[in-house]
Amino acid sequence: MKARIESVQAMPIYDSRGVPTVRVRLTLTDGTAATASIPSGASTGENEAVELRDGDPKAHGGKGVLKAVSNVNDVIAPAVMGLEPWRQAEIDRLMIELDGTANKERLGANAILGVSEAVAAAAAKSAGLPLYAYLGGAGQARLPIPMINILNGGKHADSSLDFQEFMIMPVGAPSFAEAMRYATETFQALKSILKAKGHATSVGDEGGFAPQLQSNDEACDLIVEAITKAGYEPGEDIAIALDPAASSFHENGVYRLTRSGQGDKTSSEMTDLYRRWIDKYPIVSIEDGLAENDWDGFREHTAVLGEKIQIVGDDLLVTNTRFIQRAIEEKSCNAVLIKLNQIGTVTETVEAIHLCRKAGWGFVISHRSGETEDTFMADFAVAMGGGQIKTGSVCRSERMAKYNRLLEIESDLGKAARFGR
């Protein structure tokens, strides 16, 4: 007899910022058990699925998750009890129907995704398969190129940088293991450079350094210096990726680069700034270079820069097929950031990736700034065929857990493993 869902139990835990989040434990009738812990973001798109919080100012500043936990235990659990866990799409659709809203605001995406991921993880364990093989099929053997955050700014750090993330991509590495070596050596080189220049080497939410630099340009200069100091060739071995998170400094139609003192800019002027940077630095990817509602700006942005680099939509698209389809039709990007908790189920996330593939777009599987030790996204990245993964710096164990899981997967795959796009 095939195993069925026997119990579903949620509880509140804490993420990497000490903020409450949801953990779900799901047990099958064959004794298999699996858990899923859900992350949360600091910079969130206004069209994301709703992360349900309690709103009680007397507890965790209103950020408690007891409502979401209760929704799992009292609403979702009775509805999914007795169902077969490999019916992932059916279970996800059932939870969407139980919620009954367009953005999962009644039950909460944090509640629904916790169950969705736990169902997949339990089904894989029951089948005796690694999660990546269960979700993607036996032929999936491609490891993603990591986008590794080494300098933090914006909402992720208290620094003078307007832009949220400055990342490195080990594009010239022959394997994921070597990519991690390239990255860790560059990270340590940057740390020594910052120390020598008298900067603090404390880190931000995602593990990147957060020094008090004079400008966004200085951040890129330091990264190039670190790549070279580590013995690598900028652009050949290691490239740069940016996530300005431009919505965070966009006010009344103007981009205000106030932290770095670079003044106010229009959408066109921001695109021109990026164009100059691409000519000056080995930048291969820009995510959220403009604000989440600046669709006209993004069309120009992609028309000007899209032949040279990857233009990634995050807040603009929020892992939602409706917005991704619009962006494909309007040529507003050429890649999508994929966040499971932006849309709220495994099934809908897979559908978003299939739409990207159909359009010939790239995709980046992403963490959130408030993470947990859960490694679901690492397996998910391999299951979806590699692409790219963005899961923070080579620092802080909630980030390293994902990288170490990918190293384990590459080792298990042996000679069958492939790396990169």
Curated annotation (Swiss-Prot):
Ligand binding (Mg(2+)): D243, E287, D314
The protein's Enzyme Commission number: 4.2.1.11
Pathway named in the protein's UniProt entry: Carbohydrate degradation; glycolysis; pyruvate from D-glyceraldehyde 3-phosphate: step 4/5
tRNA-binding found in the keyword field: no
Catalytic activity: (2R)-2-phosphoglycerate = phosphoenolpyruvate + H2O
Family to which this protein belongs: Belongs to the enolase family.
Cofactor annotation: Mg(2+)
GO MF, one annotated term: phosphopyruvate hydratase activity
Highest taxon of the lineage: Bacteria
Gene3D superfamilies per record: Enolase-like C-terminal domain, Enolase-like, N-terminal domain
HAMAP family: Enolase
Cofactor, free-text remark: Binds a second Mg(2+) ion via substrate during catalysis.
Pfam families assigned: Enolase_C (PF00113), Enolase_N (PF03952)
Subunit relationships: Component of the RNA degradosome, a multiprotein complex involved in RNA processing and mRNA degradation.
Protein name: Enolase 1
